[in-house]
Amino acid sequence: MKSSVPSLLFVSLVMSLNSYTQQVLYCPPDPAPENITEFVCNSPSLHEFPTGFPVRTKIISVEFTQVSSLGVEALQGLPNLQELHLSNNRLKTLPSGLFRNLPELHTLDLSTNLLEDLPPEIFTSTTSLTLLSISENRLAKLRLSWFETLKELRILSLDNNQLKEVPISCFDKLEKLTFLDLSSNHLHRLSPDMFSGLDNLERLSLENNPIRCIAPKSFHGRPKLSIISLKNCSLTNIITGVFQPLNHXVLLDLSDNELTMLDPPVAIPSANLSLDLTGNPWACNCRMDNLLTWVKEHKIDLYSKQEIVCAFPKSFKGEEATSLHRSQICPC
């Protein structure tokens, strides 16, 4: 099974941001030793959010518990808190002022909970955030107000929710964002407004969405975008030139869609572009020949060539497309 490159990148980025050197103590003892600044509370039987964290606390991990709510004062008196990990709990909602007075907070993980919505002003005070994960929840919509003050954010993970659309200009203020994960939602189309403001975006994961339409200029204005995953997105057709601005792309994953034909994605690709076309029902005709000629001329790295097989015409069904001679698929 092929690994999801964007997902692996997200894991590596999280790990790099969370390389701890301080001693870890499990849950806050009373009193806590002077040299302890990180606390891990991950008992499966824990139902209430712990209290008594010392003012010097920098990292709190309350994960894999039965905690379903936090009081609005739960994090007050912790001005040095830098990382808060609340994944794999039973959280259904969060109070509006929960994250106030946390000027040093740069990492917030709310993944794998039961969140269906969040208060409009929930992140207003978290202006130092560089990583925010709300993946694997039940969000059906995004609020513009969530992202208005997150100008330092680099990594945003919204995968595995129930999002059907991204509001116009939703990410406008995220000028420093480099990685955006919207995979495994219910998005049906991409439009230019969806990614407006993301001038520094480098990695974009959209896999496992029922995307059938990519509007022209959807990727315009993203000069640094280098990795795009559109794997398993129900794509049947891609408009010529939609990827044209991506001259710096190093990975374009179009695997496991319903594509039968594809024009060369970019006229002048980057020197190290990799392209995944596996798992599509390709029509092996002159248009496919043009694509393969482009691949050969620009020395594009094709993933798993043996899995790029013809579905049409019947005479070539099951044949490896790259093994066919030009005279066979385009005799004219």
Swiss-Prot record:
<feature type="repeat" description="LRR 4">
    <location>
        <begin position="150"/>
        <end position="173"/>
    </location>
</feature>
<keyword id="KW-0593">Phospholipase A2 inhibitor</keyword>
<feature type="glycosylation site" description="N-linked (GlcNAc...) asparagine">
    <location>
        <position position="35"/>
    </location>
</feature>
<comment type="subunit">
    <text>Homotrimer.</text>
</comment>
<keyword id="KW-0677">Repeat</keyword>
<feature type="repeat" description="LRR 1">
    <location>
        <begin position="78"/>
        <end position="101"/>
    </location>
</feature>
<comment type="function">
    <text>Inhibits the enzymatic activity of the basic phospholipase A2 (PLA2).</text>
</comment>
<dbReference type="InterPro" id="IPR000483">
    <property type="entry name" value="Cys-rich_flank_reg_C"/>
</dbReference>
<keyword id="KW-0964">Secreted</keyword>
<dbReference type="Pfam" id="PF13855">
    <property type="entry name" value="LRR_8"/>
</dbReference>
<feature type="domain" description="LRRCT">
    <location>
        <begin position="280"/>
        <end position="331"/>
    </location>
</feature>
<dbReference type="InterPro" id="IPR001611">
    <property type="entry name" value="Leu-rich_rpt"/>
</dbReference>
<dbReference type="GO" id="GO:0005576">
    <property type="term" value="C:extracellular region"/>
</dbReference>
<dbReference type="GO" id="GO:0019834">
    <property type="term" value="F:phospholipase A2 inhibitor activity"/>
</dbReference>
<feature type="repeat" description="LRR 2">
    <location>
        <begin position="103"/>
        <end position="125"/>
    </location>
</feature>
<feature type="repeat" description="LRR 7">
    <location>
        <begin position="223"/>
        <end position="245"/>
    </location>
</feature>
<feature type="repeat" description="LRR 8">
    <location>
        <begin position="247"/>
        <end position="269"/>
    </location>
</feature>
<feature type="glycosylation site" description="N-linked (GlcNAc...) asparagine">
    <location>
        <position position="232"/>
    </location>
</feature>
<feature type="repeat" description="LRR 3">
    <location>
        <begin position="127"/>
        <end position="149"/>
    </location>
</feature>
<dbReference type="InterPro" id="IPR032675">
    <property type="entry name" value="LRR_dom_sf"/>
</dbReference>
<comment type="similarity">
    <text>Belongs to the beta-type phospholipase A2 inhibitor family.</text>
</comment>
<keyword id="KW-0325">Glycoprotein</keyword>
<dbReference type="InterPro" id="IPR003591">
    <property type="entry name" value="Leu-rich_rpt_typical-subtyp"/>
</dbReference>
<feature type="signal peptide">
    <location>
        <begin position="1"/>
        <end position="23"/>
    </location>
</feature>
<protein>
    <recommendedName>
        <fullName>Phospholipase A2 inhibitor beta</fullName>
    </recommendedName>
</protein>
<feature type="glycosylation site" description="N-linked (GlcNAc...) asparagine">
    <location>
        <position position="272"/>
    </location>
</feature>
<feature type="repeat" description="LRR 5">
    <location>
        <begin position="175"/>
        <end position="197"/>
    </location>
</feature>
<feature type="repeat" description="LRR 6">
    <location>
        <begin position="198"/>
        <end position="221"/>
    </location>
</feature>
<keyword id="KW-0732">Signal</keyword>
<keyword id="KW-0433">Leucine-rich repeat</keyword>
<dbReference type="Pfam" id="PF00560">
    <property type="entry name" value="LRR_1"/>
</dbReference>
